[in-house]
Amino acid sequence: GMGGASSPALAAAVSNAGGLGVLGAAACGPRQLREWIRQTREMTEKPFGVDTLLPASVRRANYEDNDGPTPMDLVPERQAFAEEFMRKEGLELPEPGSLQRGPDDDEPALFTKEFFEAQMEVIIQERVPVYASGLGNPGPWMTGLRANGTKVMAVVGAVRHAIQVKS
């Protein structure tokens, strides 16, 4: 999955063409992730995946400060590239402000422990066919993923990480 350029339409198109379409969902809150999974299912009967991050060390949310960064705050140049790519390829752009947190937003702050846990709950509840951990160890969620028949992949950068994921 290519976070920022990924969409249900792109993932479904790749799967329908015989590849494995993957939703790059690192910055998707749980509501948006559930919506994307369901939209993808409406467009394909083929297997598809979801790719998120599971960092080992991450902060807990400070619920008194609900002003965590949004995807648009993180890397503006990357977002500009993704928007240009999506326009060129005829893909639907996110609604302006759709990635901004509202004052009454009860979703976990972006890139907190609660955020990643909520994403994994959605992935398990929605019985996603393939899950890819772009960072970190999906071990704590393997029971739920296996119970669903979800195929699990983990991207690792070192032998020691592969050993951690294997166990």
Model-based region annotation:
Residues 1-167:
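Active-site entrance/lid segments in N-terminal catalytic domains of soluble metabolic enzymes
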